[in-house]
From Swiss-Prot:
The gene is accA. It is found in: Cytoplasm. It is an enzyme of class 2 (transferase). Belongs to the AccA family. It catalyses: N(6)-carboxybiotinyl-L-lysyl-[protein] + acetyl-CoA = N(6)-biotinyl-L-lysyl-[protein] + malonyl-CoA. This is Acetyl-coenzyme A carboxylase carboxyl transferase subunit alpha. Residues 40-294 form the CoA carboxyltransferase C-terminal domain. Keywords: ATP-binding, Cytoplasm, Fatty acid biosynthesis, Fatty acid metabolism, Lipid biosynthesis, Lipid metabolism, Nucleotide-binding, Transferase. One of its GO terms (cellular component) is acetyl-CoA carboxylase complex. It comes from the Bacteria. InterPro entries: Acetyl_CoA_COase_a_su, ClpP/crotonase-like_dom_sf, COA_CT_C.
Amino acid sequence: MARRYLLEFEKPLVELEKQIEQIRELARDSEVDVSQQLLQLETLAARRREEIFSALTPAEKIQVARHPQRPSTLDFIQMFCEDWIELHGDRNCSDDSALIGGIARIEDIPVLLIGQQKGRDTKENVARNFGMAKPSGYRKALRLMNHADKFNLPIISFIDTPGAYAGLLAEEQGQGEAIAVNLREMFRIKVPIIATVIGEGGSGGALGIGVADRLLMFEHSVYTVASPEACASILWRDAAKAPDAAAALKITGSDLLTLGIVDEVIKEPAGGNNWAPLQAGEALKTSILRHLTELSTLSEHKLRDNRYKKFRQIGSFLELSSQEEQLIT
């Protein structure tokens, strides 16, 4: 079994994990029945994980969202999709491996899937550019979404990126323009679009495939206009204040649900999706199918109209009168 990568706030579980592994090795190497001891320790570890993860701060949720063993776009596709065929290239200049796409079936429903893809180790992350798509990636995504629109395929996007790639070449190739065109065209698409934040959803890089009829996110995923580190550097000239920025940015599922930005927060297994990826995949599949069923009853006009209204309402606020302000203070 691969060694689990434990985050700083999970360190209280280290000793329990060692004991569990020792008992498993004992069971493999001998005929001694240790099932009862193993069950007790696993139950205790699960309870402590539940206690830790039910009280995470926004800064700690970011660590969970960036966990190297957290299920990726391809992991989820392999879990609950059939007949997956990846499609390549933007038909302009290149094929960006940081943003993947293709067609598949979910419970016999043909769909188009797009999403950012990170790597598991340094070599894979370099090849995938750490999930940071270039203009060719967003243009590839748009090409595939137009394909889905033409053949009446619902679109499912998986968001997992720290942001769009901000290198010099990407800017020269029109990074901002590529994302802006995606935003415009996704409002025009006539088929249902469901976006899911499976890890971190950062800045315009996330929004470039995030205009949707339904926006879902996992319990420990984050969705933010800028990374807390960048926000702290801009506002306070001090990246060490990232935890303060994370709290102020309202990046968690519960905050975004309250603000009306996301439509559903999907509960994660105790310890996060990396502890029970198959369980997480089943939860995501169930949620996607439920929303697809609801959206399939709407006309093309109603879909686009609702999608536009959904985004127009983001950022709305109430302005209090002087009398109301006095009552509050």
